[in-house]
Amino acid sequence: MKHKPIDNELKYLDERSRDIFRHIVEAYLNDGEPVGSRNLSRLLQQTLSPATIRNVMSDLEHLGLIYAPHVSAGRMPTQSGLRFFVDAFMEAGDLPNEERENIEMQVKEAGHAQSVEHFLVQASRVLSDLSRGAGLVLATKQEGTLKHIEFVRLDREHALAVLVTQQGEVENRIVHLPEGVTHAQLTEATNFLNAHIQGRTLSEAKEEIACLCAETRAALDDLSHHLVETGLALLGGEGADHKIHLIVRGRSNLLEDVKAEEDLERLRHLFDDLETRESMAQLLDLTDEGSGVRIFIGSENKLFSLSGSSLVVAPYRDSQQRVIGALGVIGPTRLNYARIVPMVDYTAQLVSQLLR
């Protein structure tokens, strides 16, 4: 359904039109149902006849703020109407002390007792429980400090390259060996790499060995040098998107809002999008563009446009104020934005503090 684009006409909406529009949106956010003129007349403080209300609703529909989902139905806000409501009417207040303490207690307990991943999982679970949407955390995999690398020969043409970090993480990869490589050359390449990578991060180790290119050539024969380059390729990983880790909790909450077949199709698209690593990388980029909480409503968010979902998201940062991840709530367009915005904002600030 196409609507007239929202323009400067909205600036000149009279108080009565704004009041009626606000009540339509608030009723929709409360129960997800269209509201008719008779129900509106009971909700409004001022006394207006259903006929007068219908005339105002017609004007609001012409502006693209509301629509009728089917014949003889009441009216619901469009995505553009929800955006206008969020920008013009919504007041995101302070998070209630009870919810603030609840978030802080659960996230801090997880942070003290378990790994970073466990405490990020808890952050997504808390957001899900409090919002009744799906809580998500997008984390960039932090570089570990390297302990050693080893080449284990499998046959004449292949070896298993094993990379171990000080944190106990192990990465294995089968590599192709140049023809004629001896056991002594495998050992020589392993010793050279370990002498220069131990105690460094992946990026630091690559930079260190790149600076030693001439020394490497002088110290190693051609086949051993080839193995060193193979080890460097292993340090490079599989690209930036491989480092992005998505944590989602509360998917079942989204099923509570399903009212029709099209809602199930919307959720199918959403779950497909959440499994796409490229989408997650783009989402992190979008979050990095803003300094605080961002709200994407329906098709405004190109990543989830097919699902028609809304996303409230905020970045969290390291001690150098670099964005290292994002967290938020995703759900139907009738999210309680005024409540969820401060919730997401506070959780992002708390996670940033605990990661420093």
Curated annotation (Swiss-Prot):
One Pfam family assigned to this protein is HrcA
Query: What's a single GO BP term from this record?
Result: negative regulation of DNA-templated transcription
GO-annotated molecular function: DNA binding
Matching InterPro entries, A to Z?
A: GAF-like_dom_sf, HrcA, HrcA_C, WH-like_DNA-bd_sf, WH_DNA-bd_sf, WHTH_HrcA_DNA-bd, WHTH_transcript_rep_HrcA_IDD
What superkingdom does the record give? Answer: Bacteria
Q: Which UniProt keywords apply?
A: Repressor, Stress response, Transcription, Transcription regulation
- Protein function: Negative regulator of class I heat shock genes (grpE-dnaK-dnaJ and groELS operons). Prevents heat-shock induction of these operons.
Please report which protein family the annotation says this sequence is part of. Belongs to the HrcA family.
Cite the NCBIfam families for this sequence: hrcA
- Can you say what this protein is called? Heat-inducible transcription repressor HrcA
Q: Which organism is it from?
A: Bartonella tribocorum (strain CIP 105476 / IBS 506)
**Which gene is the coding source of this polypeptide chain?**
hrcA
